[in-house]
């Protein structure tokens, strides 16, 4: 395979690095320092390339080729999946900042949730670490040259400078905007160092900062999802995981709209307070609306200036209309310090209105509120359609085989009814279809293997059949090359209980190797009366060896040999079949093994040779018994004759003479019958397999 050395790039496997990250089953989640340390360690490992790359000087080639990652390798594919899930989690963490502003119900002012500030900032920083690692990988990931995609997988570009230029001109700006720690800066750095009311700055800045990064993060997910599905074909391994993945995206949108609904509810109450404060400027200051200000009169007018009235119940146009945010204010969810209570209530509101496409939303005349309701309606329509379509696709993939089985059974029933088959044949057909479904689950193994490369198909067949073939003594003494040739030609077959694999007198078209089940091989020696021989075949046994003798004979005719035995399945049987044409192709290789050992092995384990040998021994034993009986009868006859002669000389009584005559006649008749009876016919001697080196 020397041609593979000049036109391929060879990368070292990154599986060991994957295990170092600790994503194994029994390992705890690694810390950020551990992840970064393992990433640096993995990037320092050398990777070997083929000789087709551009020539560089000795110093540059040793430094630049060490840190390049194969874009089609298993390490990067696994990392892209991890980063995809991390990106989705990041989209779920950013809306948590919207829950930081709260309304102090006792003092009627805006305040901040300090514990939530810290928790959201820590979670956001942890997720940003994945973005940092991803950016580092992007600067060290080779790419396929677009001009080389005419044929095959294309040529990998491993030049670090070219890789950096390509990444800087594509997604680097989006990744940079996504990784900027703007929410953390606003919460932990900007707010403590300003003179304006803290809650006012937080409320105004959070929406701007979050959406500045939220849009780039959403834009980055789609090409990442496309890359994962393009390289590995799927995101999740099972259909249920795929359905859960699509459902999680729908729930993520519900979480985002619920958090926005909460923040805008706080903003609308703040707007109502501002309008009420503008009406009495002599006693009210905007700083009174925030809990870091000082005033003793704010509770007097804020309690009655902004009543929470449903939009349908408003009769006075001067009353502030909270629209779709009335529920959040009346329920007191904006005044609660319990984060989980707020989170689940707002999440339920978002999920309910997304599912209802916003049909129950009664908005006010506020333009921002109307736009928010329209976005809920459109997003719900799009997401619900995608959710139903994708979940239907994933869930149908789990039942597609069952549906195909039902259709096949229905077609079979209609066909059997149309052809008016008898009940026994119908039962056999149903039993075979049921057994085939239980064994294969509707997977067409032959079609699946046929579409695989030859070497991979050979290895799979070796995995299936090699151990079984080695249990057959005939194949145990063969070399690996011959076993590979036999394995490649084997095809799986199924037999139901009481079905016939081979019938006596029919042409033998295949040789069977039993993998599971029990069969009976019987012969009547061509239907001769009184002859019956049966043996039982168990796993690792074989039958149809007439075909092997026929295939090994260079002078054999084109007609298949006639079977001398009937093979019937006593239980459900799984076996591998070697067809006559395939066996003929392999037979030329068998003739190289012209050893006596192979010939004796074939004779010893062949059912036909065993039957013939047993019959031959029985016939020899019968001949021995007949000869022994003939000798004894001859001796008895001679003894009787001597007795007759002796009695005649002694003039014995007539009665004794008559008895002696009768005994003599009986011995003579028995001997005559013994000589006239023929031995039972022997089964025909099986043909000798030709293991010579003659060419056919």
UniProtKB/Swiss-Prot annotation:
Membrane topology (Extracellular): 103-116, 192-204, 265-367
Entry-linked Gene3D superfamilies: 1.10.287.70, Helix hairpin bin, Jelly Rolls
GO molecular function: calmodulin binding; cAMP binding; cGMP binding; monoatomic ion channel activity
Annotated a nucleoside 3',5'-cyclic phosphate binding sites: 474-598
Xref: PROSITE patterns: CNMP_BINDING_3
Gene Ontology cellular-component annotations: plasma membrane
Keyword Cell membrane: yes
Annotated CDD domains: CAP_ED
A Pfam family matched in the record: Ion_trans
TM regions (residue ranges): 82-102, 117-137, 171-191, 205-225, 244-264, 368-388
Residue ranges annotated for the IQ domain, each copy included: 610-639
Functional summary from the UniProt entry: Putative cyclic nucleotide-gated ion channel.
Description of its domains: The binding of calmodulin to the C-terminus might interfere with cyclic nucleotide binding and thus channel activation.
Subunit structure: Homotetramer or heterotetramer.
Family: Belongs to the cyclic nucleotide-gated cation channel (TC 1.A.1.5) family.
Name of the protein described by the UniProt record: Putative cyclic nucleotide-gated ion channel 13
Organism of this sequence: Arabidopsis thaliana (Mouse-ear cress)
Gene name of this polypeptide: CNGC13
């Amino acid at each position: 395979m020397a041609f593979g050395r000049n036109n391929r790039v060879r990368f070292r496997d990154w599986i060991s690095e994957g295990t170092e990250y600790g994503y194994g089953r029994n390992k705890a989640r690694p810390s950020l320092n551990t992840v970064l340390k393992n990433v640096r360690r993995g990037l320092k490992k050398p990777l070997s390339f083929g000789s087709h790359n551009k020539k560089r000087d000795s110093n540059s080639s040793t430094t630049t080729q060490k840190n390049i990652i194969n874009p089609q390798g298993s390490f990067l594919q696994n990392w892209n999946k991890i980063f995809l899930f991390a990106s989705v989690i990041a989209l779920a963490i950013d809306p948590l900042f919207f829950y930081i502003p709260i309304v102090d119900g006792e003092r009627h002012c805006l305040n901040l949730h300090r514990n939530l500030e810290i928790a959201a900032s820590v979670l956001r920083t942890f997720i940003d670490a994945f973005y940092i690692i991803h950016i580092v990988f992007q600067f060290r990931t080779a790419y396929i040259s677009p001009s080389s995609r005419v044929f095959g997988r294309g040529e990998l570009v491993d030049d670090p400078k070219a890789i950096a230029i390509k990444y800087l001109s594509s997604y680097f700006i989006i990744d940079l905007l996504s990784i900027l720690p703007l929410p953390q800066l606003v919460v932990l750095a900007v707010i403590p160092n300003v003179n304006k009311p803290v809650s006012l700055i937080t409320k105004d800045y959070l929406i701007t900062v979050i959406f500045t990064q939220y849009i780039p993060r959403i834009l980055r997910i789609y090409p990442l999802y496309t890359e994962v599905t393009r390289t590995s074909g799927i995101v999740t391994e099972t259909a249920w995981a795929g359905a859960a993945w699509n459902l999680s995206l729908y729930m993520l949108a519900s979480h985002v709209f619920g958090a926005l609904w909460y923040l805008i509810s706080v903003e609308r109450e703040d707007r109502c307070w501002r309008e009420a404060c503008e009406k009495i400027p002599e006693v009210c200051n905007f700083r009174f609306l925030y809990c870091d200000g000082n005033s003793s009169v704010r509770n007097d007018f804020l309690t009655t200036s902004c009543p929470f009235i449903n939009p349908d119940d408003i009769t006075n146009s001067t009353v502030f209309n909270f629209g779709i945010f009335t529920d959040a204010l009346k329920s007191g969810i904006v005044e609660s310090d319990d984060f989980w209570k707020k989170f689940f209530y707002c999440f339920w509101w978002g999920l309910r209105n997304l599912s209802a496409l916003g049909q129950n939303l009664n908005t006010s005349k506020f333009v921002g509120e109307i736009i928010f309701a329209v976005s809920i309606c459109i997003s719900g329509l799009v997401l619900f359609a995608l959710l139903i379509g994708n979940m239907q696709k994933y869930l149908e993939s789990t039942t597609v085989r069952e549906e195909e089985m039902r259709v096949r059974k229905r077609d079979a029933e209609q066909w059997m009814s149309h052809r008016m088959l008898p009940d026994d044949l119908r039962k056999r057909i149903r039993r075979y279809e049921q057994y085939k479904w239980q064994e294969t689950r509707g997977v067409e193994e032959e079609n699946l293997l046929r579409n695989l490369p030859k070497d991979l198909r050979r290895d799979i067949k070796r995995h299936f059949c090699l151990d079984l073939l080695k249990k057959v003594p005939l194949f145990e003494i063969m070399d690996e090359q011959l076993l590979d040739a036999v394995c490649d030609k084997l095809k799986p077959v199924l037999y139901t209980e009481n079905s016939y694999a081979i019938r006596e007198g029919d042409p033998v078209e295949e040789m069977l190797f039993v993998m599971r089940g029990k069969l009976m091989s019987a012969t009547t020696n061509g239907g001769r009366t009184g002859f019956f021989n049966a043996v039982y075949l168990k796993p690792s046994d074989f039958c149809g060896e007439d075909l092997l003798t026929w295939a090994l004979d260079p002078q054999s005719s084109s007609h298949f040999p006639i079977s001398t035995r009937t093979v019937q399945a006593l239980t459900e049987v799984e076996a591998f079949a070697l067809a006559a044409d395939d066996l003929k192709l392999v037979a030329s290789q068998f003739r190289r093994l012209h050893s006596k050992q192979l010939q004796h092995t074939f004779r010893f384990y062949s059912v036909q040779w065993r039957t013939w040998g047993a019959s031959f021994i029985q016939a020899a034993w019968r001949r021995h018994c007949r000869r022994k009986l003939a000798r004894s009868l001859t001796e008895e006859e001679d003894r009787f004759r001597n007795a007759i002669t002796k009695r005649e000389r002694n003039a014995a009584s007539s009665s004794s003479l008559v008895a002696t005559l009768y005994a003599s006649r009986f011995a003579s008749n028995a001997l005559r019958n013994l000589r006239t009876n023929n031995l039972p016919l022997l089964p025909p001697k099986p043909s000798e397999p030709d293991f010579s080196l003659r060419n056919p």
